Amino acid sequence: MLAAVPGEAADVKELFAIDLADYPSKEGRMIEVSYPPGAQDVVHRHDAHAFVYVLEGQIVMQLKGQAAVTLKAGQTFYEGPTDVHVVGRNLSNTEPARFVVVLLKGKGAPIQTPVKE
């Protein structure tokens, strides 16, 4: 499960997982993340190529060394394997937000690894 601010846990559902035959040490995973109002992730990395598609609400994403971006339904975001995700939060304190993430990662590697700043 993705970690969020205490009391505001993100709900994560695995939608799909597959071993990638052309890349024996890799796997593909698809997850749906639901942020309750005001939820915010801890600083983390994915050690994966992560492709984000926003389904509902608005989220703020920021990678270390880059500007924060606000995304709404229908917009996308990318995180590379070496990126540190310093901001991931629901922009709204009253409405939920949902997004899908497709991860191309090492087989058996965790979906998320917390990073201390």
Whereabouts are the PLM-identified features?
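Glycine- and acidic-residue-biased ligand/ion/polar-headgroup-sensing regions
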Residues: H46-G65, A73-Q75
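Ligand-binding loop in jelly-roll beta-barrel domains
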Residues: A68, D83-A109
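Histidine-centered metal-chelating micro-motifs
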Residues: Q40-V42, V60, F77-N90
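Short acidic-glycine-tyrosine-enriched beta hairpin
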Residues: K13, A17-S25, Y35-P36, G65-T82
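Sec/Tat signal peptide C-region and signal peptidase I cleavage site
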Residues: V5-A9
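Extracellular/periplasmic catalytic domains that process cell-envelope and extracellular macromolecules
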Residues: P24-S25, R45, Y53, T70, ...
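Extracytoplasmic
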Residues: S25-M30, H49, Q66, T82, ...
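Short, low-complexity, Pro/Ser/Thr/Gly-rich segments in the mature regions of secreted, periplasmic
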Residues: G108-E117
